Each structure stands twice: as structure tokens, then as C-alpha cells.
Amino acid sequence: MIQPQTHLNVADNSGARELMCIRIIGASNRRYAHIGDVIVAVIKEAIPNMPLERSEVVRAVIVRTCKELKRDNGIIIRYDDNAAVVIDQEGNPKGTRIFGAIARELRELNFTKIVSLAPEVL
């Protein structure tokens, strides 16, 4: 579960290393975001000489959470970290590579470009 003020790792090579969630896109007063939700975040740590800089406000989609994800078939998936991928207004990733495993639920939410770049889909 991701809420405002939560720090997340960045799972792509867009230039950001760490994000902090500011807002959850969707309803006006949504408390928590889960895998596949789009958030508004600020970059807290960035790689030097890259397009994205520190204190820049971006949109990101959550790809991994420490909180368990329960599927309809009874499988429970839990990751070691909270991670997101920086996206543009159309929902395409700003980076060209994705690091780490991502959940299959992103394919159902029409983030097919992120799924195709990922090395492993669970």
C-alpha cells in the first residue's frame, strides 16, 4: 500500500533513483495505491547528467509493493521493495529499460509497453 509521503525506488533507467508519492490519481480522496495505480510523485534522488532532475514532479505507475497482492486463484505475491516506473502523459515509460520483476496485472491495465520491456513478469 502506497500513500502520500511514501518513498519508492525507480525500476527504470529514466534518470531518477527515488520518488516520493504526492498524490494518487483516481478518486479525490483515495488513501492507498496498489500495483498498477498511477501516482504523482516528486523525484528525491536522481542520477547526474540525466533528463530527469531532483525536485521534478512526474507521473509514475506502481510495479512492486511490499504489501501482499492476492490473486483470484489464491496465489499471494509480495515483493521486497516498493517500486515505480516513470511514465509520460500517454502512459508510456520514459526509460528504455525496466529493472526487476513486475506483476502480470499491469498487462490487464493496458501498460503493455512496460510489460514488454520487463525482464520477468510474475
Swiss-Prot record:
Pfam families: Ribosomal_L14. The keyword rRNA-binding applies. Its main location: plastid. The keyword Ribonucleoprotein applies. It comes from the Eukaryota. It is found in: Plastid, Chloroplast. GO terms for molecular function: large ribosomal subunit rRNA binding; structural constituent of ribosome. Keywords: Chloroplast, Plastid, Ribonucleoprotein, Ribosomal protein, RNA-binding, rRNA-binding. One of its GO terms (cellular component) is cytosolic large ribosomal subunit. InterPro entries: Ribosomal_uL14 (IPR000218), Ribosomal_uL14_bac-type (IPR005745), Ribosomal_uL14_CS (IPR019972), Ribosomal_uL14_sf (IPR036853). One of its GO terms (biological process) is translation. Part of the 50S ribosomal subunit. NCBIfam families: rplN_bact. Binds to 23S rRNA. Belongs to the universal ribosomal protein uL14 family. HAMAP family: Ribosomal_uL14 (MF_01367). This is Large ribosomal subunit protein uL14c. It comes from Nicotiana tomentosiformis (Tobacco). The lineage of its organism: Eukaryota, Viridiplantae, Streptophyta, Embryophyta, Tracheophyta.
